[in-house]
């Protein structure tokens, strides 16, 4: 997948807007940027093209000395979130410049990366949509279990990747092919069609889909 421009933002929640034909469009509102460019990497020096951007400014006392020394080079403040955006071509921004929602336009297709909502420890029926065992006919205390988890002596182990009960959610999820419905630069807002990963106020990365 192509490495393209992107921006950091915060998921504010969902609402709806009306299309030109009067149709109702469910949208997610993302407050994105402005994100100062804290570092620029290029092919000659670093082996690849990328830019590091910051989001959610914090006071100096909340960063350690290595972070402070790194961010002082850009002289744009200190940030809770730093993200490196890798690019296929040269970086169109210089260190210290701002990346804003202006890089997107209504109708554009983007991909959104966020951390899914954590559900805690979940069984196989909730986590993997297993059917469970029979409700009657001798089933005892195992109605929601996963059943057999492997073979006998050969291979004598549970195979890697076997779907079992465990921690559900709280994983990095990328949803591609999302349509930008509206961009409002005066409020640093992007409205995208449908839902995106993560809880309300969760940090997301919005990138152009190459």
Curated annotation (Swiss-Prot):
<feature type="region of interest" description="Disordered">
    <location>
        <begin position="136"/>
        <end position="156"/>
    </location>
</feature>
<keyword id="KW-0699">rRNA-binding</keyword>
<comment type="function">
    <text>One of the primary rRNA binding proteins, it binds directly near the 3'-end of the 23S rRNA, where it nucleates assembly of the 50S subunit.</text>
</comment>
<comment type="subunit">
    <text>Part of the 50S ribosomal subunit. Forms a cluster with proteins L14 and L19.</text>
</comment>
<keyword id="KW-0694">RNA-binding</keyword>
<dbReference type="GO" id="GO:0022625">
    <property type="term" value="C:cytosolic large ribosomal subunit"/>
</dbReference>
<keyword id="KW-0689">Ribosomal protein</keyword>
<dbReference type="GO" id="GO:0003735">
    <property type="term" value="F:structural constituent of ribosome"/>
</dbReference>
<comment type="similarity">
    <text>Belongs to the universal ribosomal protein uL3 family.</text>
</comment>
<dbReference type="InterPro" id="IPR019927">
    <property type="entry name" value="Ribosomal_uL3_bac/org-type"/>
</dbReference>
<keyword id="KW-0687">Ribonucleoprotein</keyword>
<dbReference type="InterPro" id="IPR000597">
    <property type="entry name" value="Ribosomal_uL3"/>
</dbReference>
<dbReference type="InterPro" id="IPR009000">
    <property type="entry name" value="Transl_B-barrel_sf"/>
</dbReference>
<dbReference type="GO" id="GO:0019843">
    <property type="term" value="F:rRNA binding"/>
</dbReference>
<dbReference type="Pfam" id="PF00297">
    <property type="entry name" value="Ribosomal_L3"/>
</dbReference>
<protein>
    <recommendedName>
        <fullName>Large ribosomal subunit protein uL3</fullName>
    </recommendedName>
</protein>
<dbReference type="GO" id="GO:0006412">
    <property type="term" value="P:translation"/>
</dbReference>
